[in-house]
């Protein structure tokens, strides 16, 4: 089998729920990341060709049945680049990378692009239809399930609680981890460690706001304190 090399990697800045990137769907953001990667590596200008794209996501794009295909069509890549979509919940993006590596290892591809995209700001709900004839029953959101039985129907938040209980991880330890994570992220941002990996996203101007170039992580809370964390509900 052939060896696989990761040549480069980029991303957009992390947004927050209902924040600056709320108008962009996951395919919009993923296409911008792909174009940024192509510009950074100058792959196409050097005569290179991307064989395929593996894209992962825990949520599905509300505007497409084939988000990986739509992403490629929105990018600089051509129609002849095949795509595949991977859904493995929180492991979707890393699984997409594994699939891309496997394709290169076995010789079905030479150059692949792989990664993940998500937009919680554009998360949609599925609604039920009227199921009782002759009754006007308003559509209701259908709860999304991850398991066929209640004990399997748990998301990552519930899983984290279960693991904390299983291994005796205390609330104090969780707060310390969260605090250190925020401080390290803020310090890394201030020192410019993420600058080369973040692809700017241009947010168009409106009647009330000017054009904005979004090129940093929005979720950071550098003013986080241990006292503030300890006051949050468990």
Language model features with spans:
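Flexible glycine-/small-residue-enriched beta->alpha junction loops
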Residues: 111-163
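Short acidic, glycine/serine/threonine-rich loops at helix termini
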Residues: 18-19, 64-66, 122-128, 214
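Active-site-proximal alpha-helical scaffold in enzymes
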Residues: 86-118, 164-193
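Conserved active-site "lid/cap" helical segment
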Residues: 1-75, 79-82, 90, 162-171, ...
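Conserved catalytic cysteine-centered active-site region
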Residues: 24, 57-110, 150-158, 223-234
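Beta-strand segments within the central parallel beta-sheet cores of soluble alpha/beta enzyme folds
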Residues: 47-56, 83-85, 112-117, 173-180, ...
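N-terminal extracellular/periplasmic Venus flytrap/periplasmic-binding protein-like
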Residues: 11-12, 23-32, 43, 173-234
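Short glycine-rich anion-binding loops that position phosphate/pyrophosphate groups of nucleotides
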Residues: 12, 59-60, 117-120, 206
